């Protein structure tokens, strides 16, 4: 009996040993399979990394200088001469060079219609002496945001809207259209009076030139000129506003900006950011005629029966800022005011060394304070400004003014 038990014990022990051995072998096979799959995956990742890195290099190279196509071809030949690299890229189709070249050309076309600026490590806030609640300073050459204060927060642009009005109009008329005539209707004047808009002063049924409408829209911020210009271009203000919103889309601003009128009247759906307005001004400055209109200090409309000597109009911002040293020159500007926006303005300044800056501010406490915010910001970021040239005491007293401009 004892020997039988001993034999059974040995058999059980052998059985358990074989099971343990089989389990260990199974685990070893699983581990080996895992290592093989891991090794295979790492090789694939390595090849893919080389592949993607190579393609990225080609794209970066092509976008940096898409005109140097021969250099790209030389790069292709160099890669092909290295079998260990080429073998790692069995799926590379070097037609990607042609595609990259085409995409680079498309990018160049895009640059003609879209503008941008980005923040970097040097982007600053604004000093306490800047009163405006909202603001942004853009370096046009470097495409950087030098300073911002809620620069991408939605605001009511008020009459800064008219920068877009003249830009869209300029892009939708013939080159010889400036001498065309347009008759200002009683309905247009009634719209201006009923909405409390600023006006050039055109009378009912007064016939003026299209050029008068451009200058009248910007210099005195004339709603009569703006609506007349919109009607001349598109047949109605409503149709013209559609063109304005299409232009926002072209500029890449349609997600944060939308317009409902060409004048700048407050509406819940009429909005943009300081950044958006800076990009709109940048596009306008790039248009030769818009730049001319925005930089004109004084203008006299053509003679009409109602105004034989024309109407003398002026750019209020430029005239007030022209004797304030900033280390450069404020070349273009447009102000705005509605209750919801406070005093706001968009301006462009340059110096003789090629520095090009745009400043947009919103919600200042007065028209003079608004201007001095721009002057203060230009003085900080224009490299050539000499503080000894500023009369701080006189400017502080002047800034106490509290008039409003639409």
Feature-to-residue mapping (PLM):
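Short amphipathic alpha-helical segments that mediate assembly, nucleic-acid/protein binding
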Residues: 1, 9-13, 38, 68, ...
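Penicillin-recognizing serine hydrolase domain
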Residues: 66-96, 110-134, 236-405
């Amino acid at each position: 009996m004892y020997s039988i038990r001993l034999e059974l014990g040995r058999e059980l022990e052998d059985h358990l040993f074989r099971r343990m051995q089989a389990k260990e072998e199974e685990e070893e096979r699983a581990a080996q399979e895992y290592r093989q799959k891991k090794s295979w995956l790492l090789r694939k990742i390595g090849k893919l990394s080389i592949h993607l890195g190579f393609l990225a290099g080609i794209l970066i190279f092509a976008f940096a200088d898409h005109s140097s196509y021969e250099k790209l071809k030389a790069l292709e030949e160099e890669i092909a001469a290295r079998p260990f690299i080429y073998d790692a890229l069995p799926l590379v189709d070097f037609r990607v060079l042609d595609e990259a070249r085409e995409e680079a050309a498309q990018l160049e076309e895009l640059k003609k219609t879209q503008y941008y600026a980005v923040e970097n490590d040097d982007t600053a806030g604004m000093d306490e002496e800047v009163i405006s609640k909202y603001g942004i300073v853009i370096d046009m050459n470097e495409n950087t945001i030098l300073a911002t204060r809620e620069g991408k927060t939605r605001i009511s642009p008020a009459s800064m809207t008219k920068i877009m009005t003249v830009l869209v109009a300029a892009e939708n008329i013939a080159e010889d259209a400036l001498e065309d005539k347009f008759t200002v209707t009683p309905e247009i004047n009634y719209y201006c009076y009923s909405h409390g808009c600023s006006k050039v002063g055109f009378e009912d049924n007064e016939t003026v030139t299209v050029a008068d409408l451009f200058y009248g829209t910007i210099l005195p911020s004339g709603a009569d000129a703006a609506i007349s210009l919109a009607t001349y271009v598109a047949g109605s203000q409503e149709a013209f506003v559609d063109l304005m919103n299409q232009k926002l889309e072209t500029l890449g601003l349609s997600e944060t900006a939308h317009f409902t009128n060409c004048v700048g009247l407050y509406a819940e759906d009429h909005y943009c950011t300081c950044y958006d307005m800076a990009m709109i001004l940048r596009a306008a400055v790039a248009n030769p005629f818009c730049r001319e209109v925005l930089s004109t200090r004084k203008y006299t409309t053509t003679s009409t029966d109602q105004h034989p000597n024309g109407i003398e109009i002026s750019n209020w911002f430029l005239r007030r800022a022209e004797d304030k040293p900033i280390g450069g020159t404020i070349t273009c500007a447009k102000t705005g005011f509605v209750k919801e926006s406070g005093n706001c303005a968009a301006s462009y300044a340059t110096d003789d060394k090629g520095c090009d800056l745009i400043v947009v501010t919103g919600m200042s406490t007065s028209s003079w304070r608004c201007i001095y915010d721009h002057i203060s910001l230009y003085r900080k970021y224009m490299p050539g400004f000499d503080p000894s040239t500023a009369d701080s005491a006189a400017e502080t007293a002047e800034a106490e003014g509290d008039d409003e401009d639409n």
